[in-house]
From Swiss-Prot:
Keyword annotations of the record: ATP-binding, Magnesium, Nucleotide-binding, Transferase, tRNA processing
Name of the featured protein: tRNA dimethylallyltransferase
Transmembrane feature ranges: none
Stretch forming the signal peptide: none
Species whose genome carries this gene: Sulfurihydrogenibium sp. (strain YO3AOP1)
EC number: 2.5.1.75
Self-association and partners: Monomer.
GO-annotated biological processes: tRNA modification
Amino acid sequence: MIVIAGATATGKTELCIKLAKLLDGEVISADSMMVYKYMDIGTAKPSVEEREGIEHYVIDVVLPSQNYSVKDYIEDFDKAVQKIREKGKIPIVVGGTWLYIQGALYGLSDAPESDWTLREKLYSLVNLELYTQLQKVDPEYANKIHVNDKRRIVRALEVYYLTGKPFSFFINQHNFKSKRYNFLGFILERDRQELMDRIEIRVEKMFEKGLVEEVKKLVDMGFKDSLTSMQAIGYKEILPYLDKKISLEDAKKCIIENTKDFAKRQIRTFRNKTDFEKIEASKFEVNEMLDYIYRKYNQEVRDVSTR
């Protein structure tokens, strides 16, 4: 199994599809927003044409109105791995959602499952209020995450209110060292300014492809703005434009800034992952990275076969 991780707009999708073609593999997505049907442009979901005939798993699995947890992801991930291996192919995992990657590769802690009623109440509060609560009940975990990382803040508070124990207690107890699968892991990195420029270009292309129309269609289908899915970057910023509260240009600027902030949080999250090798994507062409990963994978296979 090969895992390609990294921040948004680092070039993971293009690399993994070419790698799958080279190694006769199939792709498992590790993106928390690509699981939703009808949400394609704003999530940068690869189109059927962009997939170039490569089978993709854990994409379009639930409606935007349905709940989907890390536990659900792990179950779908395991099924995908089994299907791919039964075909005699290589699973290639790609994405930027570390909670999914961590859960699939190392398992879950003993923290309780999500309580969606409690979670909805927490999501109704503003970030600063939530973060202030977290600092009081779990300063250790609060110091590890950003004040705007609402998903992680809500999860940590949810665990605390359900158990009376800080989320950091469960993380420290699990340790996340034992692997559920053997894998060869890589994290794509890019020069900071280059990454910011790539994000701006990506957002512009999203608007050209019809992002506004996609969000309007979701609203017309009855998916409310309070849903977790509709609070994704690229969607929540369009909603006030549709309500005529902000201009289209302001909505676009918000998406760009929020995506940049999100990428910075991802970069921090992916630091110090000792089971993963960093690849400076800014310094290499795609074919050079392919050749490097291909050689590393073949060496890994040879090493395993001689043990």
